[in-house]
């Protein structure tokens, strides 16, 4: 047998003896250990193993807490020493030193919070509570960084006088960031924080601000997002123009004339030009450049003007085209206005509006304003998407913003045969364009462009001074007609619905609906051309059997405004036809998409 095998055999033969001895030694060690632990446990018979374990955990937790507190104290002490040495070395007014101090303080505070983060459930709950309490401050709109200080004379007015002003003008202010008293309305032009006489010049012919101006100015001057719900002709243009120019004037001079810093979007060319004319009056006094961008004219001149323009007033279609071509940069436009927002959505510009706003600074870094005559669900969704805690200001006895005609307008509806409309139209023109009334402005609405052209020619043949404005005319012709009507050279204007919304035509005495519009909303917007700026107005509508589908909705508008309803109109019925969707027809249900859907489970 080889030697290696023999050695292995000898080792194997001794395995039993080694195993027995090792077992015996382990048993002896175990007995000694149990005896020792028994001796230790005997003096503390009251404590249980669970209690000992809890006490040891609490001791470890306490040690960790003390250790972290010590680290936090050391960090704070180190920060204080750095601040002290910084004060001795450099003057306190140094911006660099202030930045270093702020950074060090932030670092120390972070270390302290980290040290106290895991002390226990109670401390953790308190920390969470403090964070939740501080959250609203972090979402407070910063927008332009503008500040507003209330005039001392305004602050000194008794609250009863402010309440009386709000009640008299039916002003409803809803501020999601404040449950207490809101900013006081500027009841006088003297309360405006504007010292430049040139900027005050446009108000010299007015006694006091309109309700929408008085209520909106404080919030806009403070940099808040604002939703203004007010009837047409309430002075909304100046409501957003004054804060816009004041914000632009506060910018450093090296940022002026370097590209758009503010943008105003309007639904039609005429309304855009009208807003532009009002803003220019204020902008020129501050050395600001303003440009109006709309379709129907060459782009080259508009593109050149955009390079140095500070304020852009535009229609959504043309502005979106220029953005897509890379000719309009709105990345620095921190003041965004959507004028007549409901009208733009009605005209199908929602996609263009969203694209335009997405090219401006992000939410919270811009100030967004939305002015509208009504407050439908589509406008609410747009506001919820692009605005930060907006203040809603509603003017009038219709705070919900439902469709309602101006109560100062006398509405008369005449049911006539279709073939008799032109004859009756001529009778009305002779009645209201004679004697001392021969220069009174009369606005005649038609439904179609060809109809407007025919009616315009018919009125001109009868010897009346008349002009037309509709889609078939060039922009130059439309502008010339509108200016002639405003100046009074042609007191009669024949128009389609393109001029039915937002146009500020002063002193329109009478609106005649030669043909009823397709919707009752357009009817309200048409008659809204008269009775503006607190004045009374008259609207006469020629209603035929072809329009009977709108009779129910028209009757509701008349009743809501306490206007008489002729018996001939009631014969057509009071049923309100359901509005059909443009794409889905009558099978479309308009639902509130902001509400959470209800889950339905089927067995």
Curated annotation (Swiss-Prot):
A motif (Q motif) lies at residues 187-214. One of its GO terms (biological process) is endonucleolytic cleavage in ITS1 upstream of 5.8S rRNA from tricistronic rRNA transcript (SSU-rRNA, 5.8S rRNA, LSU-rRNA). This is ATP-dependent RNA helicase dbp3. Residues 1-156 are annotated as: Disordered. The keyword Coiled coil applies. Belongs to the DEAD box helicase family. DDX5/DBP2 subfamily. One of its GO terms (cellular component) is nucleolus. InterPro entries: DEAD/DEAH_box_helicase_dom, Helicase_ATP-bd, Helicase_C-like, P-loop_NTPase, RNA-helicase_DEAD-box_CS. Residues 424-573 form the Helicase C-terminal domain. Residues 217-393 form the Helicase ATP-binding domain. Residues 103-129 have a biased composition (Basic and acidic residues). Residues 139-156 have a biased composition (Polar residues). One of its GO terms (molecular function) is ATP hydrolysis activity. Residues 50-127 form a coiled coil. It is an enzyme of class 3 (hydrolase). SUPFAM superfamilies: P-loop containing nucleoside triphosphate hydrolases. The gene is dbp3. It comes from Botryotinia fuckeliana (strain B05.10) (Noble rot fungus). It catalyses: ATP + H2O = ADP + phosphate + H(+). The Q motif is unique to and characteristic of the DEAD box family of RNA helicases and controls ATP binding and hydrolysis.
